[in-house]
Amino acid sequence: MAGKVLGRSRYVCYNGSGDNGGDDINDDEDDKVSSCGVRTEPKLTTATLTEDVRDGAGDSESSSSGVSSRPTLANPVGPSYSSFQVDSFKLMELLGPEKVDPNDVKLIRDKLFGYSTFWVTKEEPFGDFGEGILFLGNLRGKRETVFEKLQRQLAEVVGNKYNLFMVEEPNSDGPDPRGGPRVSFGMLRKEVSEPGPTTLWQYVIALLLFLLTIGSSVELGIASQLNRLPPEVVKYFTDPNAVEPPDMQLFYPFVESALPLAYGVLGIQIFHEVGHFLAAIPRQVKLSIPFLIPNITLGTFGAITQFKSILPDRKAQVDISLAGPLAGGTLSFAMFFTGLLLSSNPDAAGDLVPVPSMLFQGSLLLGLISRSVLGYATMHAATVAVHPLVIAGWCGLTTTAFNMLPVGCLDGGRAVQGAFGKNALVGFGLTTYALLGLGVLGGPLSLPWGLYVLICQRTPEKPCLNDVTEVGTWRKALLGSAILFVILTLLPVWDELAEELGMGLITTF
């Protein structure tokens, strides 16, 4: 029968005994044709698969001794594997992002760069898949002035096809003689480097998450008002002999009393997102629709808001990232402090709800503020009666602190990346993961929050167009103050301090 030789285009004709018509195979046998009408080839079996197959030429080297004396290959299918590997690379290249046109690279190098701007000495791949070009060389002027000039000339030379990035030179030997880090210029196609628009299914998901967040916020309000359940309702759910369901009219006042807390939690988060958008508009940065994350303990874990355009510089990244937590945190603290004042007002006694005093041990900062306002007598008890605004503000401040953790693309991670660079974010991120894993920050919420970040928010932001220029001292100082607020808010009160301050009833065995 005829069989196809691996890696070859010719066919072999075998007889029934497995012979090839002779013991010796000569080089001229490659040109002979057997009686079955196809070219004869040396016999290949499992034991004697030793022919050195050569890709393309079609001719094999043979010795005068026999098939069994031929040199043995370590991998007889090597050429086929190499061909498959090359085809795989070609397929990945076709399916991958579109690369920069080599003709445009030559044109840009000749027209843009030179003695007065940036003297190019080397070119390297740029981007996640090497789809762009990175120009390395020597800067010939002030980096901001040169970058602005290159951006303007790029649009004049090739139109609106590419985005130009100014980044720190990778593996640089030292700083720039003019001061600061050495810079390079990367170029990517706009359709590759710019985020895509928000799709219809993303709007649907955002709507579903918003409805779920409303539900979790209402659930939080209901949980805070359980002591106000009508006796008939409590009896129905606790007495096994009660078979008659209570009148639904009894639930309406109970649910209405739970709504203010839900409104407060949702209002804080909406205020947070408005802060992001108000900071993004003057900087011409587009943001996606917020994807709210429901949580039954805090009402919400915040929201995922994506950048839908490339950030112009690191200052814009810091400003937009801090604007949301600053807005939401300010409103949260106003609610929290106002609620504490109302909690100590006898006229508001009818609106107060009891909460476990252990709650105030969950945050060092908020616990100390509560202790200073409410006093020893109120705090040194199993439960503390507080106004619902205290709970709303507490939840809002805790959510704000979690979102300001310096990791991934959280607000805190974006701000740290913009203020101190991507390398600093790696160090901050590892430290944050360690503290969350050990339960040092966040208490019982550290595990679910850490999983949420790992699944949804672990990836840092992509570079800004100008990813080199520093953000200034006051922005770094503001960010440092925000991180200090995060630590003090998420750090719990240790038992010795709580007992000394009279925060709750500490029981030791």
Labelled PLM ranges:
Residues 1-509:
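Hydrophobic transmembrane alpha-helices and their immediate loop junctions
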